[in-house]
Amino acid sequence: MRSNSILALSVLFFAATKAWDNTPPIPERVEGLGEGSGNLRIDFEVHYDLMCSASAALYPDFATFLDTPFLNGKVRDAVTVRYVFQPLTYHHATWIPHKLLPFIVDQCVANSTSCQYINYMNFCFNNQDDILGSTDKSFNQIVQNWTAKVAKQFGWNQKDLTDLFDYDTDTHNSEMRTRYMWKYSTSRGVTSTPSTFVNGIMVQNFPGSPDEWMQLLKDTYAGQQNGASFASHQFLQ
């Protein structure tokens, strides 16, 4: 009888600990992909919504900034960039273009030389009207139209893309991974797009020109130099 009581208490304890285990799902890899060599170990994490007009309008300035001469090369040689996406529900049907991203990430992981992650971002920015202007169409119609357009642009099989929208045929865990995108961005305190972080710190005012991006980089780099000078001074004391 005593052993039965101990067994029952053990089962109850195990059940209680499982009930209180609130560890969230852990994504299989760091959210987002990007570019840059990172020679100076300065990291830019940029959050966009593929259907956000401000994201589309301001991205070209950031692209120009990356190709701007800096030190002995270009900005992209000095920094690393990671593009992260936050599908904001007030942008009509924004979930649809974002749900293709897990498929694209997997393509990039399998073959980094043919990665279309950044090209797809550009494609979405340039074709926002196809999604945002489809208020007279059903969800399935938008999926069919968008996947046909994307498949033609990138040479992918349209069925591979439409399969992402059916739980029984999706092999990329697309729904959950799209939720991870939103959850990650939200957990970082992002409430609107575009937003950016430099070395993990959120920038309060998103830069509005290549010059503003460059000033942000120079300020960060100057901090590195001041830190190095301080460390050298301390070492020599």
Per-region residue spans from a language model:
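Cleavable N-terminal signal peptides of Sec/SRP-targeted secreted and luminal proteins
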Residues: 3-18
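C-terminal cap of thioredoxin/glutaredoxin-like
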Residues: 20, 42-49, 59-67, 143-237
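A short beta-strand-turn-helix
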Residues: 20-44
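Proline-rich low-complexity regions
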Residues: 24-27, 53, 87-88, 194
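Short, flexible, glycine/charge-rich loop motifs used to bind or transfer phosphoryl groups or to couple energy/partner
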Residues: 32-35, 71-72, 185-187
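Structural alpha/beta surface segment adjacent to cysteine/selenocysteine redox centers
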Residues: 40, 45-148, 188
